[in-house]
Every structure is written in structure tokens, then in C-alpha cells.
Amino acid sequence: MYCPFCHNEQSRVIDSRVIDSGTSIRRRRECAACKGRFTTIEKAVLSVVKRNGLAEPFSRDKLIRGVKRACQGRDVSDDALKKLAQEVEETVRSHGSSQVNANDIGLAILEPLRDLDEVAYLRFASVYKSFESADDFESEIRLMRRRDRDSF
């Protein structure tokens, strides 16, 4: 790590802390040459592999925008969406891989969204699972009711 003051590449870590719900590490460093102190933030990069094979950086904001469309007209707060996005990100990061399929993110969204708002869940699931008819909605509703019944 280069010192921002004298550009020496030797520094020592004085303090390290986990930040951003475990996705980043903040390090306080001291330059070996000039004794200047500076802070670095190291972030674990998570890439999303899309259906077409291209990879792009994971974006919590993009996830929120997608779920927000499903929640349109529903009584779902921005804070609830942020919490859901954080939960989904933690779920996909917990697999320990630096790459995740877009499909896996969609799967990780379904359960917390169902707990948040069932109508938004159905809207999201209809796009994610490519519903083609009312029968698809009916079978998904039956699955939801069965899961609710089995959870008691």
C-alpha cells in the first residue's frame, strides 16, 4: 500500500475493523518512512453473472430498484427494501464465492420478499419464474398456502 503523503510502499496496519455488515474492512495504517497515518477500505468484490454470460459488479441499488417495481402501490417502506437487499446480499456472500449467478440472486430474493409482502412476492415471482397464465399464479398461491400451513 503506497503512502498518500510520501509514496513509500511500506506501511504497517495499526487497526482493522469490519464495516458495512461484513462486506468491507477498514484499516488504519502508518507509513514506515514518514510516519503519516492514513485509512484504507478493502471491499470484497462480488460479481453477478447474467444469463447472457457477462459479469457485472453486484449492485444493492439495482436489487432495490427491481424489488421496488414489484412493490409498486404496496405499503412497503424504503427501509424495509434496504433491509431486504442487505439480507439478500448477505445470503449470496455467505456462499463464499466471488461470483454469483443472477438466477441465485432471484432465488435469494423470493423468501424475504414473501415475508415482507405476498402481493409483491407474486409480482416478482411471476417475472422471475416466467409465469405464462393464470394457472401459474394459482399454483404459486397454492404453494404459498401450503408453506404457510406447514409452518404452523
UniProtKB/Swiss-Prot annotation:
Keywords: ATP-binding, DNA-binding, Metal-binding, Nucleotide-binding, Repressor, Transcription, Transcription regulation, Zinc, Zinc-finger. GO terms for biological process: negative regulation of DNA-templated transcription. The keyword Metal-binding applies. Binds 1 zinc ion. Residues 46-136 form the ATP-cone domain. The keyword Transcription regulation applies. InterPro entries: ATP-cone_dom, NrdR-like_N, RNR_NrdR-like. Signal peptide: none annotated. Pfam families: ATP-cone, Zn_ribbon_NrdR. Its cofactor is Zn(2+). A zinc finger (unnamed) spans 3-34. GO terms for molecular function: ATP binding; DNA binding; zinc ion binding. It comes from the Bacteria. Negatively regulates transcription of bacterial ribonucleotide reductase nrd genes and operons by binding to NrdR-boxes. Belongs to the NrdR family. This is Transcriptional repressor NrdR. It comes from Corynebacterium aurimucosum (strain ATCC 700975 / DSM 44827 / CIP 107346 / CN-1).
